[in-house]
Structure formats: C-alpha cells, structure tokens
Amino acid sequence: MKKFIKMMALTAAAIGMSAGAAVAEPLKVGFLYLTTPGDHGWTYAHELARQEVQAHFGDKVETTFVENVPEGPDAERVVRELARQGNQVIFGTSFGYMDPMLKVSKDFPDVKFEHITGYKRSGNMATGNIRFYEGRYVQGIVAGMMTKTNKIGYIAPFPIPEAYQGLNAFAIGMREANPNAEIMVIWANTWADPVKEADAANTLMDQGADVIIQHTDSPAPLLAAQKRGVWGVGQASDMSHFAPEAHLLSVVNHWGPYYID
C-alpha cells in the first residue's frame, strides 16, 4: 500500500507518454483530518506531508483534504463522498476513522483505503503508521534525566494501541535513565481540547510532576508547564515556540516519505 501512490503515478505517466495516448488524468488522493491543519500538532504534520506528495508528483496527482471530520458516523459520510468524487486513494488520519473506513471500503472495491494507526484491514484497506514510539523512548530518557522529583506526568489521549505504544516506549527510556522515576498517567479522552489538557497538566503538577509529557495536540500542557516552572514536551511537531522556557523536546512526525514511498 505504501508504494501505491508512486506506482499509480508512474503508470499514469507511462500511459501519457505512449504513442497516440490521451493525456492521463491525475491520480486523485483524498485525506481526512480530525482538525484544521493549523501550525502545530498531528494534523499539521499530515498536511505538510500532503503538500510534499503534491510537490513530489506534480500534475501526476491531485490531492485534496477534508478538515474537522469528527470520529464516528460523520466520518463514514465524508469517506463515502470522497470515494464518490473519484478519489482512487483515501487516507484516514485519525484512529476513530477505522470502522467507518472499513465499512465504506467494502462498497468501493476499486478504491484503495489506508487507515493511519489502526489495525483492521480488508482486501482494499491497509493500515499504516510511523515509528513515533522511537521518539517517545528518547523523551523517556531525557525526562528521566531532568526530573528532580522523580515524578513525571503523562497526558494520554484514549486507551488504544497507538497510545500504549508511546507510553510503553517512554517508560522503557525513562527507567533506563532513572530507575527511581515513576509515571503518573491521566487519560484525557480527547485528541485536542486545550481546557482538558491544561486541567490534566495542572493536576499532574499538583501531584508533584516536574516534567509533563503529552500525547495530545494543543500547546496547553506546555503553556501550563511554563507557567509553573516545570518542563514539558511537544506532540507531533516542533512546539518550542509556544513555551520556550519549558520546552525540552518534541516528537516531530515526518509523514512525507511514508506517503511518497
């Protein structure tokens, strides 16, 4: 599945160059985003990657995206509409799109679907991810070295495989650097809600955490950490500009090579 865009784009180019052939139509690729791309976080990283795909393949592909697509029933409607509009490849970039995409994939057997971070597949629906947990491991090492209270706060989104991957990798790195450190986890049950994220960060700091880790999308935890003089990390993109006095490091997700290759 990772090679599909490149293969189809090259096929289109070959058709276009053959003698007497009509100019090939571009490969249409659609992306579903949970939030607006903005300038930070998970969706922003995917939007940068979409732009990389468009720049890399030029007029051989036509990429579009739909933003602010909530997880659940409405996602099914949007996925179905993208398929009806002639998109030959559709990427769903949030975990909650998994079941809606699987359902729609059965009705459009000639369309290729790929669900990011999921685990359910069909004949024309694949899953994909990047090794973000390697960055979490490094975060764990740094957090274990920087904490003075030996208490590290971790704001997790939902109890799903992706979240546990990151949490476990972080814990391994932290314990290697500091066997005495402990993780205090709050499940925010959101991907991006500044109020909930800030409340979670403050609760963890009230309990003695002097490093705040987030697997949520807004800069609210970093800002809360800076306000109270503790360390924090960014999620999915460089967030250092939001809280330069508190920012330790960020896991920066670079999806471009994944989508292109």
Labelled PLM ranges:
Residues 1-9:
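Bacterial N-terminal signal peptides that target proteins for export
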Residues 9-18:
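Bacterial N-terminal signal peptides
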Residues 19-24:
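Sec/Tat signal peptide C-region and signal peptidase I cleavage site
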Residues 25-261:
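A residue-level marker of the well-folded mature domains of exported/periplasmic proteins
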